[in-house]
Regions:
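Conserved core architecture of multi-subunit DNA-directed RNA polymerases
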Residues: 1-926
């Protein structure tokens, strides 16, 4: 967008604007002054005219346009002193302003001699030269202004006061301008007063310019917020918070992969029209229909009494409903407010009665709830559950780089931090809020969940985490749109990205738990008896509860009385060995108890054991990624259903995240320090390579890194604190552990272009000589994060612009190109699945069943780089992967490359280890 200066005088003449001459806003009696800033004569009396009618103020002098004035001050700082009359100047033969006591001063001096002034360009200042070009390109009447435009009064704040009226900042600016102009009109003042008034007027014009500029610019400005931004009704912004894992079974989780948990307060905003309608119907059904005889709650007797209501329609109005909903959203203290009902011929305070039945998790009736008054929370919770039962929500995190930047979920309503199953009006509410009238108002907010929660498995697609990231939530209203949402949730594309990889992965804690469950046993581990083994083998997967897992693997204590009592050691370990003698899911032989439990919970219950059989291996992050890549492949081949994927994700996350605190160990005393043997080795290596270290040899630093890490891994191999690193859940020995406890290593000094070796680890602290070297490590991390973010963002826009029109041809299409790429298929060939190669003159599709035959071989692969179809990319050049995922607009997928680059730049902030690689020059040539 380009903005030019315009001739103010032309604007006044074309629009026939009237002049504002009085600084007085209101006359006596709050009547607008006829010549003032809110005049009915000048601006009219209708809303339309007061919204569209401009006016002007005659400045009675020449003043710089504020944008020009700012530019000149950056080139010639003393211009301000000329306008204020503090310094005198002459214009020499070259047109340059020179300081001279016998010269002239004031804004009129500059105006009269404007054509004589020559602004010198320089060879080393691009911005200065651009500003000079601007001054030369604009006319004199555009650079200087004699009139100030007054915007319509509709956009200026005005409020009446006892003294006549008070206005906002903008009206004060205009009022001051009129006063300065009246002084300049008469010019009945000393010269120094004239110059100072001119200076005040010029600065005031700049203040008005800055006022509007600040309203328009940057992220919160009107252009971005209202013109370029998108404001959606019934929408909310919320911080991403972790879901709660307290379910005894996976099927009892309130927040799972299919359902997001949205708090009552946000439902009231997101579904406002539906909630209002529900509450109105509730009052009609439960109050208005029984006003002659209604059972209500009497707090004095703690019983229900039958009463005649006194005109309840006049109380429970639309205004009452709006006030209740708005108060609930904005003021947590009112959430347990009781609903008082008007009683005929009585001043007693009686309340609408709530009656329901507590249920256990199997929905069997336990007891009647003691009669209590109904609260705002009761009504709005039931309303929220009812209005969202057939709706979906769309949760988005910006920026959206691909289709996984947002996701669709069904809705569960969350309320208080503690809930219970309740049956009310013949409907079961599994997570009904616990109403506690003993909670003080100031602590009420702590008893409610007021942020949206959703499955951890969506975080990778959103590129989000729990450090304050925010999402936008919108609930879909129409039946047609909800049907589309349901179809999207039940498609393969919801789980698999354009690369063909499984995108719904678990978090770091989940990986560590799965590793602990499945890690390799030691020769010293216990072998379970046949009776114990059969007990676990025959156990039904659906009977494995969290209570059972805690009893089996957990070390527990009773802290209910504030002290630790009844300490109980676990009965079994995850590495206890079981000998399966009768084939179980096709497996026969020795396994561990943890692996058996993992298979039963995750694969048996989800139905994936029919495809995978029994998985009897240690599962770290790499192995788990391989399993989930197989899941993606089988899904594309229709060997795994979408329902099985939902079950797999929920069961995996339930056991991985809820059991984490029971069986995993992240640190031990040994993994929080450097072993003495490693300290000895470090000193020996530093002494041995003293010369190379002083010379900053990165190869030697890399060698020392590897030696120290290798020695540490040997010493701590049996320490359970190493599970964090071995599992691949978080951190790495070669980066986090090394930098923290072992050896900082090579650091690039950008000033010298050479490496410096930092011998101390972070735990060792810093010597005085190492402070500058350590500072360079901070620079190496911060610079790529700051600059790289901007670069990758711009690259994403370029990629999107250049490739957005690229589409795939029809399935089976072939452009017939003879050109191919020579590709060596790696050990992990997932990136080349479903691509076409040419073998003996024929096309072969690299399906999961076939691609293994080509690992390690160089093949001739068809590529979009060589597609000769002018309208699209043909099927044979693109491969079958995109067709299996129904992605025809393939160019839109390319923007993910910018996201990859962004993540790589961000990663440098956390990992600045210098690595040495051998590069074959031939690999660099195409």
């Amino acid at each position: 967008m380009r903005i030019d200066l315009f001739d103010v005088k032309d604007f006044i003449e074309i629009n026939k604007l009237q002049e504002v001459t009085s600084p007085v806003l209101f006359q006596r009696g709050d009547i607008p002054h006829p010549d003032g800033l809110v005049s009915n004569r000048i601006f009219g009396t209708t809303v339309q005219s007061r919204k569209n009618t401009f006016a002007y103020i005659n400045l009675y002098g020449h003043f710089f346009h504020p944008h020009v004035y700012k530019a000149i001050k950056r080139m010639f700082r003393n211009m301000e002193k000329i306008i204020s009359g503090e310094q005198y100047y002459i214009i020499n033969n070259k047109g340059i302003l020179e300081l001279n006591e016998n010269g002239e001063t004031g804004i009129e001096f500059i105006y009269d001699n404007w054509e004589k002034i020559n602004w010198e360009k320089t060879s080393d200042s691009g911005m200065r030269n651009e500003r000079i070009d601007m001054l030369k390109n604009f006319k004199k009447d555009e650079i200087f202004m004699q009139y100030l435009i007054v915007i319509p009064p509709f956009y200026r704040d005005i409020k009446s006061t006892s003294s006549g009226g008070e206005t906002g900042e903008l009206n004060k600016f205009y009022t001051n301008a009129i006063r300065y102009a009246s002084l300049l009109k008469d010019r009945d003042m000393f010269s120094f007063q004239l110059y100072q008034t001119n200076s005040n007027m010029q600065n005031l014009i700049v203040d008005i310019y800055d006022y509007f500029k600040n309203k328009l610019e940057k992220k919160t400005g009107m252009l971005r917020k209202y013109l370029l931004g998108k404001n959606v009704d019934y929408c909310s912004r919320t911080v991403i918070t972790a879901p709660r894992f307290h379910a005894n079974k996976p099927t009892e989780m309130q927040t799972n992969f299919k359902y997001a948990s949205i708090p009552i307060s946000q439902i009231c905003s997101l579904c406002y029209p539906f909630v209002v309608k529900w509450v109105k119907d509730f009052f009609e059904r439960e109050i208005f229909s029984f006003k002659n005889s209604k059972l209500v709650y009497d707090p004095m007797t703690n019983k229900s009494v039958e009463c005649e209501l006194d005109n309840p329609e006049s109380i429970f109005t639309d205004k009452y409903i709006k006030k209740m909903i708005d108060g609930y959203v904005k003021d947590p203290e009112c959430r347990f407010n009781k609903i008082e009902v008007p009683i005929k011929n009585s001043n007693k305070k009686l309340f609408l009665k709530f009656g329901g039945r507590r249920l256990n998790q199997s929905k069997e009736e336990l007891s009647n709830i003691a009669y209590r008054p109904m609260t705002y929370t009761d009504i709005l919770y039931m309303a929220a559950v009812d209005v969202t039962k057939d709706k979906h929500c769309i949760i988005t995190r910006y920026p959206v780089n691909d289709e996984f930047g947002l996701f669709i979920n069904k809705i569960h309503v969350v309320s208080t931090t503690t809930t219970e199953p309740i049956m009310c009006n013949d409907k079961v509410y599994q997570w009904y809020p616990v109403i506690d009238f003993n909670v003080s108002p100031e602590k009420m907010a702590t008893k409610f969940i007021d942020s949206v929660q959703f499955s951890n498995s969506y975080l990778k697609g959103l590129t989000g985490d729990y450090d304050g990231d925010q999402t936008t939530v919108k609930i879909v209203f129409t039946q047609e749109a909800n049907a589309e949402c349901e179809a999207k949730m039940n498609s393969k594309q919801f789980f698999i990205n354009a690369k063909g990889s499984f995108i719904r992965v678990t978090s770091n804690e989940g990986i560590q738990t799965i590793y602990t469950l499945t890690k390799n046993p030691k020769t010293t581990d216990r072998v379970l008896s046949t009776a114990d083994a059969l007990q676990f083998i025959k156990m039904k997967p659906e009977n494995i509860t969290f209570e059972f897992l805690v009893d089996t693997f957990g070390n527990t204590v009773d802290i209910s009385n504030g002290v630790s009592t009844n300490a109980k050691k676990s009965n079994y370990n995850t590495t206890d060995i079981i000998d399966i003698k009768v084939p179980y899911n096709g497996f026969k032989g020795k396994t561990t108890l943890g692996r058996l439990i993992y298979n039963k919970i995750v694969f048996d219950q989800s139905g994936l054991s029919n495809v995978f059989g029994y998985i009897n291996k240690e599962i770290n992050d790499d192995v788990n990624s391989g399993i989930e890549q197989q899941i993606a492949n089988y899904t594309k081949e229709d060997k795994i259903t979408v329902d099985q994927l939902y079950n797999y994700i929920d069961y995996r996350d339930w056991v991985g995240l809820q059991l984490h605190a029971v069986i995993t160990t992240s640190f031990t005393s040994n993994t929080l320090k450097r072993p003495p043997e490693v300290t000895k080795l470090k000193n020996e290596l530093i002494k041995k390579y003293k010369k190379e270290i002083e010379e900053g040899d990165p190869n030697i630093a890399n060698l020392i890194d590897k030696e120290l890490v290798k020695k540490t891994e040997e010493i701590l191999d049996d320490d359970i604190g190493m599970d964090l690193y071995k599992s691949g859940a978080r951190g790495s020995m070669g980066n986090n552990f090394k930098n923290m406890y072992l050896f900082r290593g090579a650091v690039m000094n950008r000033s010298t272009g050479k490496y410096e070796i930092l011998e101390n680890s972070l735990l060792d602290g810093l010597d005085k000589k190492n402070i500058s070297v350590h500072s360079n490590t901070i620079l190496e991390g911060a610079y790529p994060k700051a600059v790289g973010t901007a670069d990758s963002g711009y690259l994403t826009k370029q990629i999107s612009s250049g490739l957005q029109t690229e589409v795939l041809g029809e399935y089976g299409s072939d452009c017939g190109t003879k050109k191919t790429l020579d590709i060596t298929i790696p050990k992990k060939p997932e990136d080349y699945l479903y691509r076409y190669i040419v073998e003996n003159g024929k096309l072969v599709c690299l399906t999961p069943d076939v691609i293994g035959n080509y690992v390690g071989k160089t093949v001739k692969m068809r590529s979009p780089m060589y597609c000769i179809d002018k309208k699209c990319i043909c099927n044979k050049c693109a491969g079958d992967n995109f067709y299996k995922l129904d992605k025809k607009n393939i160019g839109l997928v390319a923007v993910t490359m910018g996201g990859v680059l962004l993540n790589l730049n961000m990663k440098k902030f956390h990992n600045n280890v210098v690595k040495i690689q051998n590069i074959d020059v031939n690999d660099m040539l195409i």
